[in-house]
Amino acid sequence: MDLLLLLFSAIWYILPAYIANAVPCILGGGRPVDFGKNFFDGYRLIGNGVTYRGTFFGILFGIITGILQHFIVILYMDPESAFNYGLSGYIILSFLLATGALFGDMLGSFIKRRFKLNQGQSAPLLDQITFIVFALLFAYPFYPLPINTIILLLVISPLIHLSSNIVAYKLHLKKVWW
């Protein structure tokens, strides 16, 4: 497969997870999913950065992304292409990817708290990779990918994540650039 097509296919597949992971930065806030509770080690379970509102809107916008992808395929691509999962397929896939991404983000926050890292402190790769790993784990049993696509996503996702965080920081949507 041509490298450019592989790159496009990988990003197209994972796009609902990327959107779901980005939206809470903009539309989050409110009650944290851990209700402000501490783990037995005395540190927060997850922290204030992961909220019900952010999680809800992350999943919602992930699903909306999947629905838009469906209509883009119908209107602008070959309906017989590998990208055509059908509307229900896109809704299910985008829900799985978005939910997996946000679960991975929560797990990453939980792990950071165990290492006594506060919200906003950098944890290289943990911040950039857990959301993508869990998005893939949630979706893979129903919508499997070839191994070369998975490897590509694991390589490019930290770069895309870092780039988008820098943009969000410059737009004053994030307090730190990482």
Curated annotation (Swiss-Prot):
Keywords: Cell membrane, Lipid biosynthesis, Lipid metabolism, Magnesium, Membrane, Phospholipid biosynthesis, Phospholipid metabolism, Transferase, Transmembrane, Transmembrane helix. GO terms for molecular function: CDP-2,3-bis-(O-geranylgeranyl)-sn-glycerol synthase activity. Pathway: Membrane lipid metabolism; glycerophospholipid metabolism. It holds the Pfam family CarS-like. It catalyses: 2,3-bis-O-(geranylgeranyl)-sn-glycerol 1-phosphate + CTP + H(+) = CDP-2,3-bis-O-(geranylgeranyl)-sn-glycerol + diphosphate. It is an enzyme of class 2 (transferase). Its EC number is 2.7.7.67. GO terms for biological process: glycerophospholipid biosynthetic process. It is a multi-pass membrane protein. Its main location: membrane. The keyword Acetylation does not apply. The chain crosses the membrane at residues 3-23, 56-76, 91-111, 136-156. The keyword Signal does not apply. One of its GO terms (cellular component) is plasma membrane. InterPro entries: CarS, CarS_archaea. Its cofactor is Mg(2+). It is found in: Cell membrane. Belongs to the CDP-archaeol synthase family. Catalyzes the formation of CDP-2,3-bis-(O-geranylgeranyl)-sn-glycerol (CDP-archaeol) from 2,3-bis-(O-geranylgeranyl)-sn-glycerol 1-phosphate (DGGGP) and CTP. This reaction is the third ether-bond-formation step in the biosynthesis of archaeal membrane lipids. This is CDP-archaeol synthase. The gene is carS.
